[in-house]
Amino acid sequence: MSLAVLLNKEDKDISDFSKTTAGKSAKKNSRERVADVAPTRVLDKKQAYLSQLNSEFNRIKRRDSIEQLYQDWKFINLQEFELISEWNQQSKDWQFDNTNDSQDLHFKKLYRDMSMINKEWAEYQSFKNANLSDIINEKDADEDEEDDEDELEDGEEDMEEDEASTGRHTNGKSMRGNGIQKSRKKDAAAAAAIGKAIKDDQTHADTVVTVNGDENEDGNNGEDEDNDNDNENNNDNDNDNENENDNDSDNDDEEENGEEDEEEEEIEDLDEEDFAAFEEQDDNDDEDFNPDVEKRRKRSSSSSSSTKLSMNSLSLITSKKINKNITINSDRPKIVRELIKMCNKNKHQKIKKRRFTNCIVTDYNPIDSKLNIKITLKQYHVKRLKKLINDAKREREREEALKNNVGLDGNDLDNDEDGSESHKRRKLNNNTANGADDANKRKFNTRHGLPTYGMKMNAKEARAIQRHYDNTYTTIWKDMARKDSTKMSRLVQQIQSIRSTNFRKTSSLCAREAKKWQSKNFKQIKDFQTRARRGIREMSNFWKKNEREERDLKKKIEKEAMEQAKKEEEEKESKRQAKKLNFLLTQTELYSHFIGRKIKTNELEGNNVSSNDSESQKNIDISALAPNKNDFHAIDFDNENDEQLRLRAAENASNALAETRAKAKQFDDHANAHEEEEEEDELNFQNPTSLGEITIEQPKILACTLKEYQLKGLNWLANLYDQGINGILADEMGLGKTVQSISVLAHLAENHNIWGPFLVVTPASTLHNWVNEISKFLPQFKILPYWGNANDRKVLRKFWDRKNLRYNKNAPFHVMVTSYQMVVTDANYLQKMKWQYMILDEAQAIKSSQSSRWKNLLSFHCRNRLLLTGTPIQNSMQELWALLHFIMPSLFDSHDEFNEWFSKDIESHAEANTKLNQQQLRRLHMILKPFMLRRVKKNVQSELGDKIEIDVLCDLTQRQAKLYQVLKSQISTNYDAIENAATNDSTSNSASNSGSDQNLINAVMQFRKVCNHPDLFERADVDSPFSFTTFGKTTSMLTASVANNNSSVISNSNMNLSSMSSNNISNGKFTDLIYSSRNPIKYSLPRLIYEDLILPNYNNDVDIANKLKNVKFNIFNPSTNYELCLFLSKLTGEPSLNEFFRVSTTPLLKRVIERTNGPKNTDSLSFKTITQELLEVTRNAPSEGVMASLLNVEKHAYEREYLNCIQRGYHPNVSAPPVTIEVLGSSHVTNSINNELFDPLISQALSDIPAITQYNMHVKKGIPVEDFPKTGLFPEPLNKNFSSNISMPSMDRFITESAKLRKLDELLVKLKSEGHRVLIYFQMTKMMDLMEEYLTYRQYNHIRLDGSSKLEDRRDLVHDWQTNPEIFVFLLSTRAGGLGINLTAADTVIFYDSDWNPTIDSQAMDRAHRLGQTRQVTVYRLLVRGTIEERMRDRAKQKEQVQQVVMEGKTQEKNIKTIEVGENDSEVTREGSKSISQDGIKEAASALA
């Protein structure tokens, strides 16, 4: 029971208290009288009341401690299942050890702990049954705080041991069953005793009599309410713990208790509501109030000290709960924390402000036995308290006044008070007659008549408090009856069901534990079996592991043996392959050596064979060996030695030579089968085997003189023909390969009477060149040009379709010239012929062995094949193999072997600068020398000038750099991969065969477009505004309109046709339509507005004011300012004074025109000044020609330098003439507007006079030309740029937006001034279109040749370039204009963009650097720094190095100059000796002018 209940109850019963204590208060009308109160009596009443109140508090404390003991007992019972489960788990841990000694130790420890626990439990039971108050009273009251804390700690340790002993007491063994039952009986007895004590105490509380009759009874009821609430909260907390423990236990048996989960959730919901009510607290802002708190503390010190220890110990017991994760051996503070968490789980504090007066014991100090009480008053009680304090103050003042007032009679006052009190007492006795029996039963009686908290109140206030309390009391009980009763009933039922379930589980666990002891022997047997199985399993695993290790070791040994055998086999195979390679090389070398001695290639090239080579081959003569073909796959390379293999190689070489000779002889026999018998003696002359080693002179039928090296080439070709061997004439471009091949044909015709048929296959661009060369050097040969459309070729095929056709001097044709495309198209017809000699010009066209032209040409029947090429190797060694296999299929039959021999080493040397195997290179040269003849210009042609190569490096412009970065960001493939693809060897050949490679090449092409010119992506368009205009019609349209009677066209022509006749229109005399455009909008101005606003009137005086200003206020008017005009006349010599007035009123533009036209009055000598004479001479000068240019040098220079640079700053989007305004009945407005806009004098001066008008003026009207009005005053550049709103793309911007074009523009100016003629090579025809626009803008004479040019046009273009020196630039595509044509008229070659293949560029530049060139040739190559073009150029240098290594055996140093052009167009020139085998360009000190 709390003090708040007592206070609230006192408010209720204050009226009864006032009735029973009539002497305590007076009537309402006599309250102002002063009463003499005995101080001693009042103090006695207060002391009695306070002692009574303290006794009540002591009784409440005792009852609460007993209740806490009871709750503690319930908590222990509800936690048994969880504790037993934990003990079972620990008992299982003891059974892990299989030794009996460990078991005995565990059991001995268990027995020892159980005995100690029984002893502690007995002490605890005696402690609970003892009278705690007597025990505490025996304690020393003056003991210090440290001793009290020690006692509390001892009590906590005892309780911890009690809990642990309770846990261990129920653990494990069946022999402890009796002890468990006994302890439970003791607990049940103690719980019964506690319950009985609680009931007795409650009954005793009901019988207690307090002050003011029913006051204490109601107070007890209120106290019971609080105790009930506390008990409910404690029960709720216990139920929470029970539910949590049950949830933990139910997790082990989910199948049995699955239906109890929903019930537990409902319990948790109920607990949350109850816990919120339990946790309610008072406002912290209210002040504590107790009038006699010090006295109460003194009075309650003795009684409260008796219950101090019990309250502390029991509060610790109720706050400790066992967590399922805490073992019985855990520390007590840890267990306490876990129990607090369990109690507060899922609880939410809900603080509600009390609506009634409350009193709570906030603190109790056991040292000085002080009890702190917090009283929270509601608003009404606060006001009442203030009023009582004021009344007490006034009471004291009255008492002091009474002491000082001697005139008053104290006895009268006492009588009056006694009378009033007796009257009130009688009234109270009548009202409380029914409750007299109950009052007699009360223990205490009130005699002091004071309020419960020592204050007074009247009956009205007491009744108000009573009503308020009744309403609150009724509301609380209604809420409890409506909400809490059903909850508590369900909660009790659930607790009972859970408890029964826990009991059942506990019993089952106990039975299970009992059975474990009975099945001990069985478990030992089972353990033996388990151990046996485990041993067998471990043994099996051991043997398996042992076998696996042995197997792995055996496999390892076998693997090592196999690897060793494989290694030995690889070494053996490598030796075998080396022998095979040596065999093939020896075979080829012997064949080449024999042929080389026959045809003397070394002597023709100017080289001598080394002594080692001669020494190595002198022992074997393949001509003396019997031809025997040894199958390459049948040779045993393992058993035969090197000498035997060498002999077999010699036999194969002899066999190859015999087959070649037999083939040539068979071809000759078949060709001469139809000869007459008397010519049989000449067969030996034509037989190649009997010609012998002779020196061939130049054929007489050859209409030219061969140079010395060309005559040697003729001898070499003749020897090849005699031996029946094919060859490659690989002289450097420009040394006359064409004339040497023609001389061979002349040699065969003159010396061997072999007139054909000969086949010449050449690129399409050189067809006419070959025809011209053959007809020029061999006029006796009949040429068949085989090209054209299908019908033309069908007619040409009739020449060789004749039966028994014999080729002699009178044959229909001797040489057929065709292109590679025609060979592929008409291969079926050409294969039927047997050709004596087939010449392939620009043989790099068949560099791919997979192409259709290579396969078709290889299938042709011909005695000898001659390949003409200046670059036998362009990209890789595979191209060289393709040419060698074409001329010698029997020797060079496998590309893989050739690649294994030479390609890998040489190409890797060129790419990575690795060391080259000189022996291997020497053998390659030995193989190639008999079949290939190559001379370079510097060795054989001393009169040919040098060739200087200059690389011009430019930086990207701003627009190009942005486009380049955008392309790099949009391409998903890595940019480095694209650059590698750009530099790949097979890029130009096989890229189209692969989709991925083609995508990369397309990406590369986009980057190259950016480097060339950004306009290759998008051109700037012509910009013009929208014209909202009706245009005038020309004469042809008017003629058609008159013929068709189309009045609409004539009416819209804006021309006055009244003076025109149909004859004039038909003759076409009227063609001047200047200012003929009109606005489609016409506006008719009302006449009323025109008269009021435009015509002069009293409202509109604008015209009058202007006239008045120009006449009256003009200082140059002679009538108003005569003296000034006279003074000016004397100064200027002007006789007329009105002339000043006229000049001042004439517009400035008209005055300029009049002054330009010169003086009108030529009779006046005063105007014959020098200035007028000059003007007259200038005016009479012709408008065009040398004289006009000389007279207007300054004007032309000014216009060219300044006016041409002026461009429009604003371009309108729409243009329209002024709206036409008409006034009905008046033409003044229209005429004034037209005169203002289209003044005839100004229009005539700014524009030119039409030719027909000039004719009419001079011829028909007889006006001299010198009297024609001055025209064309508006400068031509301004007239071009500002006379129309149409904006053309700026050519200056077009030039400056490309780095290459800007540099080329500067370069061409320099070359033009120095008299050079330029060849410019391109890769893109679209770029050639842009270049033509540029050359037209700069007015350079140029011609163009590309792949779209026709054959006959190509011949004419080359002829014009060679013969017409006025042509400054020749635009060519590298593929079409770089082969087989002679362009020696040019001495400068510019590569705007380079080709994939460096040899293509080399052939293109040799179009100018060849025989016939007398000047030094300079080659410029435009490159963009930091782009993909640099990567392509580096790769091209590597390819050139491969060519140099293969053809000459070493790298050739070339003089290269590099010009670096920066952003400010400054040039940094570097010149030095550049070795192709080195990366980069070495800087030099010299600069290029």
Swiss-Prot record:
PROSITE patterns the record matches: DBINO (PS51413), HELICASE_ATP_BIND_1 (PS51192), HELICASE_CTER (PS51194)
SUPFAM superfamilies associated with the record: P-loop containing nucleoside triphosphate hydrolases (SSF52540)
Subcellular location: Nucleus
Keyword Nucleus: yes
Chain spans, region Disordered: 137-311, 393-452, 1456-1489
Record-listed Phosphoserine modification sites: 65, 115, 133, 610
Domain Helicase C-terminal: 1303-1467
Any one annotated GO CC term: Ino80 complex
Family statement: Belongs to the SNF2/RAD54 helicase family.
Protein name per the record: Chromatin-remodeling ATPase INO80
Organism: Saccharomyces cerevisiae (strain ATCC 204508 / S288c)
Record gene name: INO80
